[in-house]
Each structure stands twice: as structure tokens, then as C-alpha cells.
Regions:
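Catalytic glycan-binding domains that act on GlcNAc-containing polysaccharides
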Residues: 1-166
Length: 166
């Protein structure tokens, strides 16, 4: 698993499923730390400088510069604080977190309000931006694949099976 130590550290500290972080990272940058979007988002988790500045001091980087977002440790640490805030805001609902991460918090809140609280499976259908809807579906598929491959400590299920058979 690429960036396993950084992902696990952040996931444990912020109570985020590490496999969700991997799913988000795969979709955002295909695990390329040097990725840069046309909108200027940078690094593994494609943070914009403005968003990163909101969380940089809490992450221990009060003098953050835009180029720092290409450093995997910094990018993951800042994104984790942001994602943890979104998880709290959306009551642990990962689909809404992904929608917010891509389409904005206000939009995700609006889409969630149109969803029956007892039927959150309908949430993705309520997403008003085709790009964000597609993004959420891809992130959640990535997340489910990582849940099939790894436990919460990112240990491969197949490796554990091999160890047990020895």
C-alpha cells in the first residue's frame, strides 16, 4: 500500500477509515504526489491552497506554502483534518463527505437535505452535479474494493490467509 504509514497515522488520529482515504486518494491523484489540477489543487489529495490554509496550523504547518502541498506527509496531514471535520459535519456519512470534498460543503448539505434520512442510499441520486455524482460513485467503489482487500490496519486479507495456513 502506497503511503501506508502516513495514511494509517492520520486515519487513527482522526478516526477515519484508512481505506476511505485510499479511495479518495486514488480518485484525486491516482497516488501521484506531484499531481496538479487545472484549478490549482495539489498533491495526493488535491488540496487547493486556500482550503489547506484553513487547516495547516492545526496540522502543524503554520507557514504553509503552495509547493508544500506536494509533500505527501503535509498533504495527508492537512487533508485528514479537513476530512475529519467533514465526517463530523455529515455524521460519518462517507458519501456526503466525498460529495462535499468534490462539490463543496454547501452543495452536499443541500443534496443531503433532499434525501430521506432513513434512506441515505438515495443520496447519490440527489447530487446535482454530474461530475460530483460520478466522483462519489468512483470514490465509494474504490473504498469498497479496499475494504475487500485490506483490514482497517491496511493488512492484506490474502497475506493473513497465507500466514494462517503456514
Amino acid at each position: 500500500v502506497l503511503y501506508k504509514n502516513e495514511v494509517l497515522l492520520c486515519a487513527r488520529n482522526k478516526k477515519i477509515d484508512a481505506r476511505f482515504l485510499l479511495g479518495l486518494m486514488k480518485q484525486e491523484s491516482s497516488f501521484r504526489s506531484n499531481a496538479k489540477s487545472p484549478a490549482g489543487a495539489r498533491g495526493l489529495l488535491q488540496l487547493t491552497y486556500d482550503t489547506a490554509l484553513k487547516y495547516s496550523t492545526a496540522a502543524g504547518y503554520p507557514n504553509l506554502q503552495p509547493e508544500d502541498l506536494y509533500r505527501t506527509d503535509i498533504n495527508i496531514a492537512i487533508a485528514c483534518i479537513y476530512i475529519a471535520e467533514l465526517l463530523k459535519k455529515f455524521d460519518g456519512f462517507y458519501e456526503a463527505v466525498a460529495a462535499s470534498y468534490n462539490g463543496g460543503e454547501d452543495n452536499a448539505e443541500r443534496w443531503l437535505k433532499r434525501t430521506n434520512p432513513n434512506d441515505k442510499g438515495v443520496f447519490v441520486a440527489e447530487i446535482g452535479f454530474p461530475e460530483t455524482k460520478n466522483y462519489v460513485l468512483k470514490v465509494m467503489v474504490n473504498y469498497q474494493i479496499y475494504r475487500q482487500l485490506y483490514d482497517e490496519n491496511l493488512k492484506s486479507y490474502s497475506n493473513r490467509m497465507q500466514e494462517k495456513s503456514r
